[in-house]
Amino acid sequence: MNQSFVSIATTIYPPSLQLKTLATLTSKSGGKTIVVGDQKTPSSWHETNISFFSLQAQLAEDPFTDFAKMLPINHYCRKNLGYLYGMRENPEWIYETDDDNLVSTEILNPPSLSSKETDHYIDNQGWLNIYDYTNILNGPELVGTVWPRGYPLELINDKFQKSDSREKFDYIEIQAPIANGLVDGDPDVDAIFRLTRSLPLQFEKLKRDLIICGGTWAPFNSQNTWWHKSVFPLLYLPVTTSFRVTDILRSYVAQSIIMKFDMGIRFFGPSAIQERNEHSLIGDFEQEIPLYLNSQKMMSEINSSIQTSDNIAQAQFMAYERLEKLGFVESNELSLLNCWIESIAKC
């Protein structure tokens, strides 16, 4: 069955208000909601308008059982199976979020794949702090002092000098097959920010969507993100990194490949509110250390590794091959990636 879009989340908790709201809005918009459980998820889990896959169902769900058995138990990357179940519905888009993110719009609609005359285009910027492009309604003095998880720490105090040569206001015809939205409340900042700053934050709606193009990099997460079917393979969450690294490292790989093939990434204003599940901030800090130390090196190495690639799948393998050689992922990551690609072919 063809769906306009499928919404994907994973959880270890009973059905939350956030997931119930997601399912309602997705259904009203003609989509389907899929939730992936784990060993800690209550065995009685059930919710109207949600297709739920327990751990037992995952291990028995042909044709993805091989991949399901390779994924570690009690691990966020079991969300990869949700993507595969979603792809099987043959949607145009996959929307992904988490069980502690409440969609704050009245309707949930996929973004535009093609650029629009109202978009704001940025290229050749280098690293971009997306939070610098919006005001903070409940703390205007914080503008310029907030940074997303995965943004290089050594660049936090650098002020981007806006210039006409770097910001394109004229219409550019480009496709943006990935779109990431801001999140109010407890947004995706790193543990250093959480340990030293105050939350919550409320962002002003962006006057226009931003599309970042070649030569510009901005980390994005798995909390409020749309993926077009043309780039579904790039949904792969690397398994052998920490929970706090996996989606950010994926974003480095995905945007490098997107821009290698002359596409862009759309960023849009706040459309969800996060009431964060319980975390150990010191534990988060420890998990995020690879990003604190190596974000620029990771991005540089990924970019250089894919220059001779001819297609997305080849570029993705080359990127993770380089990351494995440098020790940023473990030696079995390539086997997992190969099984992922084989599983996509079965959708």
Predicted regions and their residues:
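N-proximal low-complexity "stem/linker" segments adjacent to membrane-targeting elements
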Residues: M1-K32
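Active-site-proximal specificity loops/subdomain of glycosyltransferases
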Residues: D38-P91, T105-T118
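Conserved catalytic core of nucleotide-sugar-dependent glycosyltransferases
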Residues: A60-D66, T105-P238
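Short aromatic/hydrophobic "clamp" motif used to bind/position activated sugar donors
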Residues: I94
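Acidic metal-phosphate-binding loop of nucleotide-sugar-dependent transferases
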Residues: D100-V103
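A short, conserved alpha-helix in the catalytic core of glycosyltransferases
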Residues: P219, T225, S242-M263
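Active-site donor/metal-binding and catalytic loop motifs
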Residues: V231-T241, K260-F285
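Long, compositionally biased intrinsically disordered regions
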Residues: S271, G283-C347
